[in-house]
Amino acid sequence: MCSSDLVSKGFEGKERTDMEGLLKAGAAGFTDDGIPLMDGMFVKEAMEEAARLDTVLSFHEEDKTFIKQNGINHGKVSEQLGIYGSPALAEDSLVARDCMIALATGARIDIQHISSGHSVEMVRLAKKMGANVWAEVTPHHFTLTEDAVLEHGTLAKMNPPLRTDRKSVV
């Protein structure tokens, strides 16, 4: 059985867990799943430790400083509803940062549930540069667009939100 453990104690992004001890106890990798790690130096140090231990880090990439209302893309639908939403920049900025840190540290990283075509391109570029980075996309992000919010209401709200170009993440 494989399981992952937290990168940071209590999902707070301030103090790293004992990755070495957790690996010995059976952890297969590390993630603060659903909680973006905002402190770049913390991420760099976690990646250095992960590279030393030859383990994987998995990241949820949404910079909350760009987000006013999470769960819906900042675009035509959010404007129609009078909501600012979450721009792709919130994801793109952390993907770019973490791809470059992975390249610099030699860490293996996974970008979780990618939703932006620009983020996909950054992952591809980082791989070409030699970074050991990959990403996954959920079925709803490559089959639906932000228009689903108009049809399904809050059932179509998620983090990261559905974007405008579903084909760009394939």
Which sequence ranges carry the predicted segments?
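Active-site beta->alpha loop and helix N-cap motifs at the rims of alpha/beta catalytic domains
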Residues: 8-12
